[in-house]
């Protein structure tokens, strides 16, 4: 209110000063029409005596109401639900003895300007202090839990902390609110019923500060709890990993113990057998005490029953090798690109503390580690990114590496590779260098032995394969049973060659060759092509199983699938794998012949049209459409012959000839329809075979009638009409044999009546 009055007085004073200091306006004569108005005397115009300038100007009711409304708004900020009471602003304010300003702060000798300066200095210090206090409250240290907000701290500086007044001290207010017997309604009625606006403002501010402090404490407690939970969670994860590692180690230990137990049991069994055998030999010696000499007891290796080897130790050794390779893959970056975990591959030696030298100057280049495998040499150098890991520098097959020791130094080895590159390495220990050289020599000797065994096995396989190729005959075009080539050829003909070699012996040789190919020792990795060939060779047995169960469709599909894969592999196969490819191709040809032979028998003996169509379609899938059509037509010819034989006696010639015409020509018509259904894509190429067969069947019909006329029997016009009717029915499928009937009538016109 004081500030508002001072502002208004200052504006009035400026207006008076401006009017007094403008001489131009005083020169203007006054208007005669309007009377001269008296200007109000400004109480602040004469400020010579500061003691008389303390009197405040009066404020009207409207401005006083505006000031009161502003004060209500300031008080309503602290409490949103605050409703200001209806007050009479004409009444004087009550006395406030608690708010007496100390005498130290009042100086009657100060003038108006010094009073304003002092207020400005106090207001300028206030925000900085509150800023420092609020910054200190926002720190997240553990010691800041009990700190109060800035406003409470500022208020506590005015009121001592030892005071128990809840209106001025937030600590006492907090204790009061924490009391379980605290009643808010009673407190408001007793303490705040007759309180002043300033007291209510202080109490509201204390409540707000206390609420902020509690919220900050809650946030800090939540943050602390979250950090503790995360710490416990991390510890649990570490413990879980350790438990998994311990569990894996326990499982490995159990496996090793089980294997050791099995090995011990087998060794005890073998030892018992050896002891029993020795005891039996000792009894035999005692029974033959009259013999001139005593025979030594049989050893374990001399008994055929004891020649069985215990391979459990080999399995343990292979697992140990795999573990070493896995460790190599973890420690050496890029090792998996050059080394595969193939069965039998293992590490012979791992030598560290080697230094690669310049072959020309002999200066050291980098630290390396050399790994000698049973068929590879891997050299790894230190990785620049990681201090403890290695990265692959060179990797070559052992047979392509030549290692020599320098004459003037026992610690240096010169490695010469197949690509005409060479590297010089030096070791700190001369014994380590000699041991590495011995391991390489032994590994190369083992590779030479394996290579010789492979050469002998390959030579034997080539000779056997060459023998099979010379004795094996592939079905050719002459086996096609087309009516144009051989109409009455026996369907049970054999395709065995002229030499005295049976199919059983060929099969026996093929089995031995396959076993020899798969049992070959391999010094290098089995390529993907070789693995596919082995898989295809196993698929040949599936054909035999399906064929034995008379599942011709599955057998044909498997055969065609293997043939397509062999054709794909033949383009990128090596010379070493070409022999196995030819061997599998030879076995596939045998299975093809077996399938075609059994399909031929099935087609000829089938009386159901469904099985007949299925067998014919399978023959077409095998690439034998002409042979399939020939078998199909021969089956239909046999079917016509069987139906004719079932007619019986020929007491009524007219009825007999009518039945002959119906059987033959209706079967021909049905056969043409089945041909169009089975041979959809190949009908245009082999339709001539069908037309020839139909023509032959029509000729056979008239030949059979001629045999009936040999007994001087006469033909009735009814039988001729029935034959003409059936022949005309063939026109529906595109066949017209009316001219054959006309020729028959002309030839036997004298016997028709």
Swiss-Prot record:
Residue ranges under compositional bias (Polar residues)?
115-136, 467-476
Please give the residue ranges the record annotates as the region Disordered.
1-69, 101-136, 467-498
What does the UniProt keyword field contain?
Answer: Coiled coil, Cytoplasmic vesicle, Exocytosis, Isopeptide bond, Phosphoprotein, Protein transport, Transport, Ubl conjugation
- Using the record's annotations, give every residue carrying the modification Phosphothreonine: 58
Bias regions of kind Basic residues — which residues? 7-18
Alphabetized InterPro entries for the sequence? Cullin_repeat-like_dom_sf, Exo84, Exo84_C, Exo84_C_1, Exo84_C_2, PH-like_dom_sf
Q: Tell me where it resides.
A: Cytoplasmic vesicle, Secretory vesicle; Bud; Bud neck
> Compositionally biased, Low complexity: which spans?
103-114
Keyword Cytoplasm listed: no
Report where the covalent cross-link Glycyl lysine isopeptide (Lys-Gly) (interchain with G-Cter in ubiquitin) sits: 219
Q: Which Pfam families match?
A: Exo84_C, PH_EXO84, VPS51_Exo84_N
Any one of the GO BP annotations = protein localization
At which residues is Phosphoserine found?
Answer: 139, 482
Coiled-coil residues: 227-279, 531-585
Q: Which GO terms describe its cellular component?
A: cellular bud neck; cellular bud tip; exocyst; incipient cellular bud site; mating projection tip; prospore membrane; transport vesicle
Function noted in UniProt = Involved in the secretory pathway as part of the exocyst complex which tethers secretory vesicles to the sites of exocytosis. Plays a role in both the assembly of the exocyst and the polarization of this complex to specific sites of the plasma membrane for exocytosis and to the budding site. Also involved in assembly of the spliceosome.
Could you describe the subunit structure of this protein?
Component of the exocyst complex composed of SEC3, SEC5, SEC6, SEC8, SEC10, SEC15, EXO70 and EXO84. Also interacts with SNP1.
* Family that this chain belongs to: Belongs to the EXO84 family.
Protein name (record): Exocyst complex component EXO84
From what organism does this protein derive? Saccharomyces cerevisiae (strain ATCC 204508 / S288c)
């Amino acid at each position: 209110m004081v500030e508002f009055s001072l502002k208004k007085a200052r504006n009035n004073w400026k207006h008076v000063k401006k009017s007094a200091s403008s001489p131009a306006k005083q020169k203007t004569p006054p208007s005669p029409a309007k009377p001269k108005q008296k200007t109000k005397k400004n109480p602040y115009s004469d400020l010579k005596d500061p003691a008389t300038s303390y009197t405040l100007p009066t404020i009207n009711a409207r401005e006083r109401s505006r000031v009161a409304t502003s004060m209500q708004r300031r008080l309503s900020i602290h409490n949103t639900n605050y409703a200001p009471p209806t007050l009479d602003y004409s009444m004087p304010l009550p006395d406030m003895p608690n708010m007496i300003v100390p005498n130290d702060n009042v100086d009657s000798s100060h003038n108006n300007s010094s009073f304003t300066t002092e207020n400005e200095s106090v207001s300028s210090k206030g925000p900085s202090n509150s800023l420092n206090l609020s910054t200190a409250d926002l720190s997240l240290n553990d010691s800041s839990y009990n700190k109060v907000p800035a406003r409470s701290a500022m208020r506590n500086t005015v009121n001592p902390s030892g005071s128990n007044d809840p209106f001025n001290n937030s600590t006492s207010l907090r204790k009061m609110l924490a009391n379980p017997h605290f009643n808010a309604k009673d407190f408001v009625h007793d303490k705040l019923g007759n309180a002043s606006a300033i007291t209510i403002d202080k109490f509201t501010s204390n409540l707000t500060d206390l609420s902020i402090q509690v919220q900050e404490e809650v946030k800090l407690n939540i943050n602390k709890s979250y950090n503790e939970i995360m710490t416990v969670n991390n510890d649990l994860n570490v413990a879980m990993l350790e438990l998994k590692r311990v569990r894996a180690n326990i499982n490995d230990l159990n496996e090793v113990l089980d294997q050791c137990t099995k090995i011990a049991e087998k060794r005890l069994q073998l030892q018992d057998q050896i002891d029993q055998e020795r005891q039996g030999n000792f009894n035999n010696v005692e029974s033959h005490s009259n013999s001139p000499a005593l025979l030594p007891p049989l050893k374990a290796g001399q008994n055929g029953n004891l020649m069985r080897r215990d391979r459990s130790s080999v399995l343990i050794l292979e697992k140990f090798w795999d573990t070493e390779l896995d460790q190599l893959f973890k420690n050496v970056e890029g090792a998996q690109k050059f080394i595969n975990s193939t069965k039998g591959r293992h590490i012979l030696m791992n030598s560290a503390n080697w230094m690669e030298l310049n072959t020309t100057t002999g200066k050291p280049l980098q630290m390396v580690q050399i790994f000698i495998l049973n068929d590879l040499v891997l050299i790894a150098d230190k990785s620049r990114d990681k201090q403890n890991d290695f990265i692959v520098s060179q990797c070559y097959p052992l047979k392509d590496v030549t290692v020599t020791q320098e004459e003037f130094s026992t610690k240096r080895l010169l490695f010469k590779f197949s690509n005409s590159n060479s590297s010089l390495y030096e070791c700190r220990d001369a014994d380590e260098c000699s041991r590495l050289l011995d391991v390489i020599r032994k590994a190369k000797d083992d590779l030479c032995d394996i290579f010789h065994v492979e050469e002998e096995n390959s030579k034997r396989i080539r000779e056997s394969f060459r023998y099979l190729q010379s004795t094996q005959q592939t079905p050719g075009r002459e086996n096609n049973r087309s009516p144009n080539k051989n109409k009455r050829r026996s369907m049970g003909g054999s395709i065995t060659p002229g030499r005295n070699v049976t199919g059983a012996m060929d099969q026996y040789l093929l089995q031995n060759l396959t076993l020899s190919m798969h049992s070959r020792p391999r010094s290098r990795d089995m390529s993907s092509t070789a693995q596919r060939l082995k898989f295809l060779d196993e698929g040949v047995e599936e054909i035999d199983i399906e064929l034995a169960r008379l599942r011709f469709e599955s057998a044909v599909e498997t055969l065609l699938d293997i043939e397509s894969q062999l054709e794909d592999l033949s383009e990128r196969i090596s010379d070493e794998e070409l022999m196995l490819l030819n061997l599998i191709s030879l076995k596939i040809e045998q299975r093809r012949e077996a399938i075609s032979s059994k399909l031929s028998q099935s087609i000829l003996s089938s009386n159901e049209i469904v099985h007949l169509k299925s067998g014919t379609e399978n023959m077409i899938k095998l690439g034998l459409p002409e042979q399939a059509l020939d078998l199909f037509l021969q089956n239909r010819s046999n079917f016509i012959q069987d139906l004719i034989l079932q007619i019986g006696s020929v007491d009524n010639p007219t009825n007999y000839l009518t039945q002959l015409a119906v059987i033959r020509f209706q079967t021909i018509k049905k056969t043409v329809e089945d041909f169009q259904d089975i041979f959809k894509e190949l009908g245009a190429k082999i339709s001539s075979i069908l037309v020839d067969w139909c023509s032959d069947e029509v000729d056979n019909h008239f030949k059979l009638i001629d045999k009936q006329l040999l007994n001087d029997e006469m033909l009735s016009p009814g039988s001729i009409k029935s034959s003409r009717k059936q022949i005309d029915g063939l026109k529906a499928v595109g066949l017209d044999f009316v001219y054959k009937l006309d020729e028959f009538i002309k030839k036997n016109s004298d016997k028709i009546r």
